[in-house]
């Protein structure tokens, strides 16, 4: 489960510039969480994931994350190898604001870093140097840092699929050892039917050119869809609905921030409350959906399809 609690090796109020050793290897699933504040007069700051701390010659930088506030605000990402910079990857969707606090979550994935700021996905950066070689984090520039924390994890290390708390229905999807993803469409029976306090977790990765995908909670006997979650990346809409008595109801689309982006890893948590479903993406609450299908105990099936790699499903 993606949680920003229980971080390890937390460093509080470090003096900037800060250069510190990362005590364990960064493997897929590891998180680095940096909380701080941008001063009024800041023009730029950077977080560098380095191979050592040498100054002469300068240590290689596997991932250089550099928000800039001068002229057009942007985030510049790059890699430094043998004192030479590679090509810049620039993101103009700027989540940082002067005189505002921030929380940056760097997640290490198998092929890339995934970065979220204040709970919102910001960018992906493909590995040019293996993250397992990174042993140092450096923070430089005009920035105040309140804390740096780590969660060393190998949850995603094997990327082997699982379906805990569910019994898969469509035989072609039955798990094979070492399989890298669950095939779609995926349908599975919950080992215990839905009700207040029940939770379903779906872990996956959005395809590069994804248009949409859907996650449905279904009453198996009637095939009514109690909860239809349908992120549409092509229009940035997170559509919710129910399919009851052979008819779709009224769509709900209102959302503060669309939480998905092509190529990103996600953990979707669906929690069943007495009056509604609550949905969180990557540990951040996203929406509520009032129950339209009242017989919660009849909801016994999970269905997933669309433009994603489905890695893991769990229910308890």
From Swiss-Prot:
One Pfam family matching this protein? Gal-bind_lectin
UniProt-annotated binding residues for a carbohydrate? 68, 78, 88
Site positions for Critical for binding to sialylated and sulfated oligosaccharides = 58
Which cellular component terms (GO) are annotated to the entry? cytoplasm; cytoplasmic vesicle; cytosol
* Domain Galectin positions: 18-151, 186-316
Q: What is its main location?
A: cytoplasm
GO MF terms, alphabetically ordered = carbohydrate binding; integrin binding
GO biological process: what's one of them? T cell costimulation
Q: Which UniProt key words apply to this protein?
A: Autophagy, Cytoplasm, Cytoplasmic vesicle, Lectin, Repeat
Localization, per the record, is: Cytoplasmic vesicle; Cytoplasm, Cytosol
Q: Could you describe the subunit structure of this protein?
A: Homodimer. Interacts with CALCOCO2/NDP52. Interacts with PDPN; the interaction is glycosylation-dependent; may participate in connection of the lymphatic endothelium to the surrounding extracellular matrix.
Functional summary from the UniProt entry: Beta-galactoside-binding lectin that acts as a sensor of membrane damage caused by infection and restricts the proliferation of infecting pathogens by targeting them for autophagy. Detects membrane rupture by binding beta-galactoside ligands located on the lumenal side of the endosome membrane; these ligands becoming exposed to the cytoplasm following rupture. Restricts infection by initiating autophagy via interaction with CALCOCO2/NDP52. Required to restrict infection of bacterial invasion such as S.typhimurium. Also required to restrict infection of Picornaviridae viruses.
Q: What name has this protein been given in UniProt? A: Galectin-8
Annotated source species: Mus musculus (Mouse)
